[in-house]
Each structure stands twice: as structure tokens, then as C-alpha cells.
Amino acid sequence: ASGYEWSRVEDQLAQEHTVYTLDLLGCGRSEKAGITYTNFLFVQIICDFIKNVIKEKTDIIASGFSCSFVTTAAAYDKESINKIMFINPVSMISLAQTTTKKDKLFKFFIELPIFGTFIYHIIVSRETINDFFLDKLYYNPFHVDKDVLDAYYEAAHKGGYYAKCLYSSQSAKYMNINIRHAVESIDNSIYIVEGEDEPNGAAIVEAYQKVNPAIESATIPCSKHFPHIENVEAFLEQVGAFF
């Protein structure tokens, strides 16, 4: 992931808000560490950033897997986080999956110095990233921006050998956590935005609302995983209505 995904909306948001675009450890422009990344590591980073940098109660917009970090952070530190907007969050069923022996073996092989690095470079090659964006992330393939692809390619390779540690940790489910209780217990205002063509998007939103009926939602037309990139105007309209 990369903070670059917010480049099309951050200037507009900054007109009425103080905006911080945070690349978490191992992501985007941030340092790549040779560690096993976990959900709670990112929870600590988010809470520490709010406490030490922002220094006031904070509204958060998060997308994809990062939504689980924010959910846990809101349950862990109720005084730091105010309103929350999620963009296409990962399903709670998927997040509840735990690491298996097969997952641990995969992580071991990916983190091998030569063989693992070779496999990782195939997985994050320009061609693979391009195909993934076209097939999985964009509603309209003609919307794919070369600068976005370049940012994600750079993020996947920045940091040399340790660049692969985030991927190996996520693939082996070390970053997973069952957030059902957190979703149920937090009393923050939560608004889920889903792309019209996001696979299982409607079912995922329904599952969150079943656990916490106070959650509101909206669907952004002509978009998939990145409504804040593909349909900026409609996305900003939802942000303006919520915050």
C-alpha cells in the first residue's frame, strides 16, 4: 500500500481539514523492517502517531486491510479516535482466519535470501502489478494511472531485502485479527464506502452492519476498490456529508 492512493483527494480534503497521510511501517514510503508484521503493531503506530504528532482526537479514513487496524485502535484507545470512514474493508470472516502450518512454511520460503527473493520479485513485477490493478482493483481499466502503478511498484521494492517482509506476514495471516467484538463494542460513528463493482462489497457491508447496526454506508458508482481514485467527486461528496 502507499499513501499515494490519496493524492487525488488530499488537496481538496485539506481545504477544510488538517490532513495527515500516513504510510505505516513497511508500506509505501516508510521504512521496511525485517520483522513479522502484526495487526497490533500497526495499532500501536496509529495510536502513537495520534498521541505524539496530531495531539487531538482524530477522524480517520482508511481503506482495505488498514480498516482492521483502525477498528482495533478505536477499541484499544477510545479517547484518540473520533469518526471513522472505511473504504472497502476486508471481510470479518477473512480477518478471523489464523495462521496455519502451511502459511508458516510459505512465509519461511518467501523470506529465504535467494529463492524467496526471486519468487517475491515475480509476484511484485511490473507486469503482475499492472494485471492485478486491471483485473482486481479498477472498475474501468482506462482509469488506471501510470503514476499509481509506479508508486505501488516502488513501494513493493523499496527497502531491498526487507521489502518482502510485509507481504510474507500478510500472506501468512500474521496481520489478521478477529475484529468482530471490536466492531460490536466501539461507539464511534462509522461510515463504510464501497465501490459499486467491489467483489462481495455489499455482503461485507451487510455483515459489518449486522454486528453493529449503527454503521452507515454508501456505494460509489463507477468504481471498484479505489472509489477515491476512480470517482473523486462522488467520494468527496460522501466525505463532506459524513465529516
Residues of each region from the PLM?
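Conserved catalytic-core motifs of eukaryotic protein kinase domains, centered on the activation segment
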Residues: 5-6, 30-36, 96-98, 203-204
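Conserved hydrolase catalytic core segment
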Residues: 55-101
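Post-His helix in hydrolase/transferase enzymes
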Residues: 229-241
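Conserved loop-alpha-helix segment in the C-terminal half of the alpha/beta-hydrolase fold
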Residues: 185-223, 229
